[in-house]
């Protein structure tokens, strides 16, 4: 019994030292996958293939079009960059598409005030069939990424067994930390185990990973957004408590600026991902994105809410028969983010409510700012009736903050 206790304590101490101190707020940036997938035909489609040129052009846009200054600093490579391994077993990029190498791209990103993320897979192959990181290559690959001055690693889980994942993800976390370079760690481990306990140990994940994918890949459609949202809401009692500074649930990329969402739905995804304290990884063509979609993604108040220092993940607190849902995220300085979300598909809906219905204090007077319109609603008390008009598959989002406390008469 004593030996068992000592072993458990030793394992616990080993896990705790993997904490790397990174990503105290949800990471923000750009990720190639959803928009550009595994397009490797640079002869047919040179502007959109997975290549050095694509990432340099996206880096330029991040730096020059205001994204970096708002916090979108990660430039993340996904699958299909690998050319193979050299004679020493080190990973090398595809030399035609990445002629100057990954270290060159990292230096380029850093010169613009950005960070570079890279992708690998714990298994024999990546999801698209490129060389993966087997257990015997974990330490070697971590060292390679550090030598390239990479700032984030996304480690996928295709072609691996549950046993390999249970060994490999903690091993990679330790290997990254051992390099001495601060490399944020994005894990896909829980997504391959069904996303829920008992197969997923979220306490362990929070110690070894900075963010993790729990559910299916998002696709460029409203149906896919709702599928992800529904899974997160259904399991919010499990997922919400484990998220926080340095360890985030990741519902996957933002689709805004692509082809599958209406304007209202784009606003809705941005608001809902923000209230979930989600990483904000765009995956769109920043060279051609519309001004309307830029406005959604570059909304300063939205970003302030997403980056709130408390790092509390929000929850759905009401589901009405009218197909209106209300989400709440507690923020610093006793503020809150509230999202009124319509699943209706017919016409704008007049939703009537009060702060009392949302369990706000009766001793405080609040003010709300509409996150998208900027309108201010003053003098809100718990019993103040209000109406918000929500478009089909759209949202109204409030940033609610106290302006004064009321004197409550002594009984």
UniProtKB/Swiss-Prot annotation:
Signal sequence residues: 1-17
EC number: 3.2.1.49
Phosphoserine PTM positions: 322
UniProt GO MF annotations: alpha-galactosidase activity; alpha-N-acetylgalactosaminidase activity
Chief location bin: other
Uppermost EC category: hydrolase
Cellular component, GO annotation: cytoplasm; lysosome; membrane
Subcellular location: Lysosome
Transmembrane regions: none
InterPro entries listed in its UniProt record: Aldolase_TIM (IPR013785), Glyco_hydro_27 (IPR002241), Glyco_hydro_27/36_CS (IPR000111), Glyco_hydro_b (IPR013780), Glycoside_hydrolase_SF (IPR017853), Melibiase/NAGA_C (IPR035373)
Binding positions (substrate): 78-79, 154, 188, 213, 217
Keyword check for ATP-binding: no
Catalyses which reaction(s): Cleavage of non-reducing alpha-(1->3)-N-acetylgalactosamine residues from human blood group A and AB mucin glycoproteins, Forssman hapten and blood group A lacto series glycolipids; a neolactoside IV(3)-alpha-GalNAc,IV(2)-alpha-Fuc-nLc4Cer(d18:1(4E)) + H2O = a neolactoside IV(2)-alpha-Fuc-nLc4Cer(d18:1(4E)) + N-acetyl-alpha-D-galactosamine; a neolactoside IV(3)-alpha-GalNAc,IV(2)-alpha-Fuc-nLc4Cer(d18:0) + H2O = a neolactoside IV(2)-alpha-Fuc-nLc4Cer(d18:0) + N-acetyl-alpha-D-galactosamine; a globoside IV3GalNAc-Gb4Cer + H2O = N-acetyl-alpha-D-galactosamine + a globoside Gb4Cer
Active-site residue numbers: 156, 217
Record keywords: Disulfide bond, Glycoprotein, Glycosidase, Hydrolase, Lipid metabolism, Lysosome, Phosphoprotein, Signal
Domain of life: Eukaryota
Job of this protein: Removes terminal alpha-N-acetylgalactosamine residues from glycolipids and glycopeptides. Required for the breakdown of glycolipids.
Protein family per UniProt: Belongs to the glycosyl hydrolase 27 family.
Protein name: Alpha-N-acetylgalactosaminidase
Species of origin: Bos taurus (Bovine)
